[in-house]
Amino acid sequence: MIIPYGVDGHIKKTADDWLAKEKKKSEKECVRFLFVGRLVYYKGVKNLLEAYSELVSKEPDLKEKMTLDIVGSGPLEKELHEYVRETGLQDRIFFHTKVTDAQLVEFYKKCDVFVLPSQRRSEAFGLVQIEAMIFGKPVINTNLPSGVPYVSQDGVTGLTVEPSDIEGLAQALKKMTIDKDCRTRMGKAARQRVEKEYTMEKMLQKTYDLYEKLVRGG
């Protein structure tokens, strides 16, 4: 029996309050993508930067329609910073290495799409997906042999691409940038999926049910 993680109760309460107060907004000038995590190889951040660069290089009209926030630190930090400078995307891709929990919540609120481009099975679940989804954000993730593509489902709560598929990731970024209806629909579905499967209450209930079954010798 698999018991998935539950989203932190404080984060869920914050998301509930924010969504309740959120009013309809006019069309944004640009779509904000967000990555949260350690800047290490298996997270696939370099792939994300390459996909972003490839997309705006082939379709320059999209450059002013999208931005990317990278929240986190790690051993690849210097290399990733240099890549962004070399591609001239310093005004579209932004690094945030020291972020408080309160600031992280604001990043979740302000982003339009969350991206988890992990390329190795080391990414077993991707709890950050759930944290973004509870704020009604669609997810772009990768088809790893782990829990990652199970959390956010392709075509329902977001888009799933093959690990290390730069072109596929670029096309997913494009789709989410130009298709507002898709973002809205998948964002709503993402929120609903977390409420149904990934609350702390759900996790505790499944844990209780499992122990009860074991005690009974099931």
What is the role of each PLM region?
Residues 1-18:
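Donor nucleotide-sugar binding/catalytic pocket of nucleotide-sugar-dependent glycosyltransferases
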Residues 25-54:
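Conserved donor-binding/catalytic core segment of Leloir-type glycosyltransferases
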Residues 78-99:
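Nucleotide-activated donor-binding/catalytic signature segment of Leloir-type glycosyltransferases, i.e.
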Residues 98-99, 106-111:
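Short alpha-helical donor nucleotide-sugar binding micro-motif in glycosyltransferases
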Residues 109-124, 137:
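Acidic donor-binding loop of glycosyltransferase active sites
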Residues 134, 138-142:
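Short hydrophobic beta-strand element within catalytic cores of glycosyltransferases
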Residues 153-155, 159-166, 175-181:
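Conserved acidic donor-binding segment of nucleotide-sugar-dependent glycosyltransferases
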Residues 168, 175, 182-197, 206-209, ...:
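A short, well-ordered alpha-helix in the C-terminal region of glycosyltransferases
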